[in-house]
Amino acid sequence: MATVPKSNMGPTKAVPTPFGCIGCKLPKPDYPPALIIFMFCAMVITVVVDLIGNSMVILAVTKNKKLRNSGNIFVASLSVADMLVAIYPYPLMLYAMSVGGWDLSQLQCQMVGLVTGLSVVGSIFNITAIAINRYCYICHSLQYKRIFSLRNTCIYLVVTWVMTVLAVLPNMYIGTIEYDPRTYTCIFNYVNNPAFTVTIVCIHFVLPLIIVGYCYTKIWIKVLAARDPAGQNPDNQFAEVRNFLTMFVIFLLFAVCWCPVNVLTVLVAVIPKEMAGKIPNWLYLAAYCIAYFNSCLNAIIYGILNESFRREYWTIFHAMRHPILFISHLISDIRETWETRALTRARVRARDQVREQERARACVAVEGTPRNVRNVLLPGDASAPHSDRASVRPKPQTRSTSVYRKPASIHHKSISGHPKSASVYPKPASSVHCKPASVHFKPASVHFKGDSVYFKGDTVHYRAASKLVTSHRISAGPSTSHPTSMAGYIKSGTSHPATTTVDYLEPATTSHSVLTAVDLPEVSASHCLEMTSTGHLRADISASVLPSVPFELAATPPDTTAIPIASGDYRKVVLIDDDSDDSDCSDEMAV
């Protein structure tokens, strides 16, 4: 603080307070009355424009959907920082100018200094955040949405204000806040601590200026390099340049307005004896008034250079002429905002539910299939025991290879013509050992009618060592309206006769093809099954589900015959039981 002669010291209108006599002996400013009146009017205009303009900026960002982005969130935060000085310090400054000094308490002086520091430091930090946001938007556009998402932007905003508070609080203990009659306000006095003064100025002013200058330099280089590219919309390019220029002008105005105050502060702190008497009082007053005037310039710059802000300003001015309409529109906008957020959350929940349902439906086929069906071993399966891939060459199927077991009610006719039902239950696949190496089948164009097929044969002997004959689908006859998947298992007996002769099956009707030798599969069994020449078989396939618990066959053991079935779409092996009364063998089959 500059020293003044004793003759300039005199009593003021200050009165004693509980915090001490503030301003009992202060230097009288040597300003002419006209200058004081001019400064008073300028500060009144500054306060009014500051409050109205920054309020309109906040309303514009809140109401206009085009202005609701991460960059303008920092613009609204900058407006809040500018409004702080217009709410508390500037009115007290006007009061001090009107009464000719400070006659308020020391606590109010401390609060004025604290709020002023928060406003100034908050403004420069928000300008730095705006510059970084513009830099990421133009120079790193691919990562912009990830870096400045809504959640991240809110975090950056909180961090900005936390850094502002941490930067100002040390001044409350290290630097002393005193009333300066040259500026009619309470400021930080760093005369007794020059090192701390230089550090504060570098952190609060110089370092942010370097960061902002670097960001805008890179942005300008990027804009010049991308001028008039092929396929670029000129309107969009012009809008980006205007937006960049708006933020750059805001930065320049802040630097120009606050640079004189910071320079004077550093000079007085470093060389107080030389500079104290050389700096006139009016220069201090002009420097601080220019700095204070910066708080109302930002809203004006937005309205001049940004078309979206300008349109919103006109809307707000029109609404101010009709307060009821303005309040109604404001309530409607708030309701629409909440409804939009609720709808967004509902859409997110619905999308998550649809994804969960799709995942559940994707696994329902496997989860709903019995384990004994899912573990059916097909010929050529690599996990089958004792398998020989070389001997099994099944033809690739055009349909799904998964086996779905359909129920089959097989009615057998005896020689006398009376039907005798044979109940067939499937056995678990774990009790049957299959050896696909001995099963050979070749598809043939043999058509088979379920209830009118007659077989002629004298002695047909089969030899099998506990084989699994699997079929995927059969082509149904007149009594069946859809193809059915079946799997047959032959459980070996105790006798092991050798193979004698094999008679080829010939259909009795002339409407069916005759099976040739290459069409018959060779199935070896460990017991002898004989089929009479007069056996009449009729197959009736139903659509009910097969029971999973095995049950016994009829009293008379059946003859098991392996018949290859081949149609235009399905080529499978089907096991058919012929219940003959004179058979001596007992067998269990799982279909």
UniProtKB/Swiss-Prot annotation:
Q: Where are the transmembrane segments?
A: 39-59, 73-93, 112-132, 152-172, 197-217, 248-268, 282-302
Segments of this protein annotated with the region Disordered: 378-427
Q: How does it assemble?
A: Homodimer, and heterodimer with MTNR1A and MTNR1B. Interacts with KAT5. Interacts with RTN4 isoform A/NOGO-A. Interacts with TGFBR1.
Q: Name one GO cellular component term.
A: plasma membrane
Extracellular face residues: 1-38, 94-111, 173-196, 269-281
Where is this protein found?
A: Cell membrane; Postsynaptic density
Identification of the protein by name = Melatonin-related receptor
Q: Disulfide pairs?
A: 109-186
Name the InterPro entries on file: GPCR_Rhodpsn (IPR000276), GPCR_Rhodpsn_7TM (IPR017452), Mel_rcpt_1X (IPR002280), Melatonin_rcpt (IPR000025)
Q: Does the keyword Transmembrane helix apply?
A: yes
Superkingdom: Eukaryota
Q: Which residues lie on this side of the membrane: Cytoplasmic?
A: 60-72, 133-151, 218-247, 303-591
Q: In which tissues is it expressed?
A: Strongly expressed in the brain with highly restricted pattern of expression, confined to a subset of the ependymal cells of the third ventricle and a population of cells in the dorsomedial hypothalamic nucleus.
Q: Which PROSITE patterns match?
A: G_PROTEIN_RECEP_F1_1 (PS00237), G_PROTEIN_RECEP_F1_2 (PS50262)
User: What is the purpose of this protein?
Assistant: G protein-coupled receptor that plays a role in numerous physiological processes including regulation of energy metabolism, neurite outgrowth or cell migration. Promotes self-renewal and neuronal differentiation of neural progenitor cells through activation of the NOTCH and WNT/beta-catenin signaling pathways. Modulates the KAT5-dependent glucocorticoid receptor signaling by modulating KAT5 subcellular compartmentalisation.
Name the family the entry cites.
Belongs to the G-protein coupled receptor 1 family.
